[in-house]
Regions:
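Aromatic sugar-binding surface patches on proteins
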Residues: 6, 86-91
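Cys/His-rich microdomains that often coordinate metals
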Residues: 14, 28-29, 110
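Short cysteine-rich clusters marking metal-coordination/redox-active sites
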Residues: 7-10, 22-24, 106
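Flanking scaffold residues of small Cys/His-coordinated metal-binding clusters
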Residues: 1-2, 16-19, 101
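Exposed aromatic-hydrophobic patches
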Residues: 54-57, 89-97
Length: 116
């Protein structure tokens, strides 16, 4: 399972295969913790088009409150990450036949996951 870190100062996202000591902006960061089940605002919508699963969200993307990334970890161990900035549309595409875990992170509420 991938381990994720997020720097609250500059917005950098770090990943590792195992827990690690991660430093950024003069601070040591702990691994992100799971926020539990996403409420309606933190859920991802999915539609299938031309053999692709397209994940989107109606989550706010303001400077203060936004999804910083969506990541997919394939069962083979490969990770694909899409980073988002405030005011950027949340959109993440996967081949329909890919299976594994999808992770997404809200800078205020934490990390979410689901099997896909």
């Amino acid at each position: 399972m991938a381990v994720f870190y997020f720097c609250k100062e500059c917005g950098n996202v770090f990943t590792s295969v195992n827990k690690a000591t991660v430093n950024c902006c003069g601070e040591t960061w702990n691994p992100l913790e799971f926020a539990g089940e996403p409420n309606e605002k933190h859920q991802l919508d999915v539609k299938v088009e031309n053999g692709k699963r397209i994940y989107t969200s109606h989550h706010p993307q303001t400077d203060e409150h936004y999804f910083a990334f969506i990541a997919f970890e394939c069962k083979c161990g490969t990770t694909k990450i899409r980073y988002f900035k405030p005011n950027e549309e949340v959109r993440f595409c996967l081949d329909e036949d890919k299976h594994g875990k999808l992770y997404w992170f809200c800078n205020l509420h934490g990390l979410y996951e689901m099997e896909v």
